[in-house]
Amino acid sequence: WHQGGQAKYHPFRHGFDEFFGFTHEGHYFVPPPYKGVTTMLRRKTLPGGSKGRWVGDRGLIYSTHMGSNEPDYDANNPIVRGGQPVVEHEYLTDALTREAVDFIDRHDDKPFLLYLAYNAVHSPLQGADAYMKKFAHIDDLHRRIFAAMLANMDDSVGAVLAKLRESGLEDNTLIFFLSDNGGPTRELTSSNLPLRGS
């Protein structure tokens, strides 16, 4: 949503009848202890005071690649259904897709507006294990996680489009796909070269 976390900015106060998601800027894709994903989090200093990359158990990786600490995305920013916090254990991109497909199922008999705001491929970098395996050939871990997140989102958008097709709504639906970021700096996996800016 990212339009503000205070009650006056909640989607219900801006014309929406249903809401599933989070209201602040970002969110972890799975809750701690981050089971089923490879997680890379930014840290100013690694355990032991070193720089570079530190690999822990269960796919948790700390990196000084940005020179700052990853914000606590989930603090005071729960996943909510309607106005009530819910515990979501499914990878967030998949959970948002599940809810979108369910929404289409429940509203396929009348016009609707579905605003689906994925947080992928925004940080934190958390790639689902199944997608990480698909990109095992990518040596650079940052890029591998990014590719896993992007492929997951691509499949998820495909699932929403397939539901529209299955429901007979494909030819009577306007679809807008927007991204709030260009390619991030090299530290976050990509480059826009030979173009300038990000």
Task: Please give the residue ranges for each predicted region.
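Histidine-centered active-site microenvironments of extracellular/periplasmic hydrolases
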Residues: Q6-H14, P124-D129, I138, D155, ...
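A long, amphipathic alpha-helix that forms part
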Residues: Y91, A95-H107, Y131-T173, S190
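Formylglycine-dependent
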Residues: H2-P111, Y118-G127, A136, A147
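Detector for Asparagine
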Residues: N69, N76-N77, N119, N152, ...
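N-terminal start-of-chain detector that recognizes signal peptides
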Residues: V86-V87, A148-L150, N181-L188
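Short beta-strand segments
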Residues: L113-A117, F176-S179
